[in-house]
Amino acid sequence: MDTETSPLLSHNLSTREGIKQNTQGLLAHTIARHPGITAIILGILILLVIILIIVAIVYYNRSVDCKSNMPRPPPSYSIQQSEPHHHFPVFFRKRKNSTSQQAHIPSDEQLAELVHS
């Protein structure tokens, strides 16, 4: 009696073993019966995987290029950045318009007022 055709003997195998053998048998049977169709299907699957990888690489490179090639603002344009979080009180923070950051050059009128006073 053949073990593949006997339902009682194949039932004694574990379920996983039985499914594995049935799947392998079906796949081998299909490949042996239709080698051309199987080759075409495998070729299509391989091409799809290659195309998917290429699309993923191009998409990733495009997103990286978009981030790195953002137009730079002119130097006179100031970007407000959020201040970093410090653990000391607010009054110790640097002021944005402090005299150390901006050089204040007095005009001639202001110099004349200082001389007269």
Curated annotation (Swiss-Prot):
| Domain of life the protein comes from | Viruses
**Transmembrane segment boundaries:** 39-59
On induction, the UniProt comment says: Expressed in the late phase of the viral replicative cycle.
Annotated membrane topology: Single-pass membrane protein
What's this protein's family per the entry?
Belongs to the asfivirus minor capsid protein p17 family.
Record's subunit section? Interacts with the minor capsid protein M1249L and with the hexon capsid protein p72 capsomers; these interactions form a rigid zipper structure that stabilizes the capsomers. Interacts with host STING1.
UniProt protein name: Minor capsid protein p17
Provide the species name: African swine fever virus (isolate Tick/Malawi/Lil 20-1/1983)
